[in-house]
Amino acid sequence: MIVKKMPILQGFPDFETVKFFTGKFFQKYNFTPVFYDIETTGLSRNSTYLYLIGAVGIEDETWNFYQWMAENANEEETILRIFSQFLQQCDLLISYNGDRFDQPYLEARYEKYGIPSPFTGKQSLDLYLTLKPLKSLLKLSAMKQPCMEEFLGIKDRIYDNGKECIKLYKDFLKKRDAFTADEILGHNLEDVLGLGRIFDMLGYLCIYDGDY
């Protein structure tokens, strides 16, 4: 398994910004959020598997970025168990389309291995669903994450999209080369850091709702 951890020193919303906006949605909240994104070998929860999780959490008053990547299908269960442990102190999960894909996918994989769901009792902020009312207001062509980032003027993505990453991962399983692994990890890093950037669009939602 490939494991990465690094502090996020810039390009992510500060604690007070995250606390302010999440506080508008959740009253019973102790501010232990986790931003996360997953990479899988396909969309089906039953015939494909999880191979990478990227997450951002708070440690020692610093945002830290974590990644766990399977080097073969047998490591999926280990990643699921590690992520479950990681979420023990978390009370809010922040994702993009996570309510419709990431969380249901993970729930199915946890069930497959007989592992209790780590999502029980935790709140979820799906930025895709939450920001959807802004599509017409901001005249967005689509609600995909890269489209939202482009609206914000963020055009610094350099890695392949999720679909291409599936092909890259299959190549990685054959070749085991570090360059391909870095390509996959880089895409996931951009997705997770993108969550922080899109999070700031909750400010537009306050204007939309007249809450300013």
Walk through the language-model features, giving the residues of each.
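Two-metal-ion RNase H-like nuclease active-site motif
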Residues: 32-41, 188
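Conserved beta-strand scaffold positions in the cores of enzyme catalytic domains, especially
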Residues: 33-35, 65-67, 124
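Acidic catalytic cores of enzymes that act on phosphate-bearing nucleotides/polynucleotides
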Residues: 200, 205-212
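N-terminal accessory regions of nucleic-acid-interacting proteins
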Residues: 1-30
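Short glycine-rich phosphate-binding loop at a beta-alpha junction
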Residues: 92-97
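Metal-dependent phosphoesterase core characteristic of DEDDh/y 3'-5' exonuclease domains
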Residues: 48-57, 63-64, 98-202
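Nucleic-acid-processing active sites and adjacent nucleic-acid-binding tracks
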Residues: 64-84
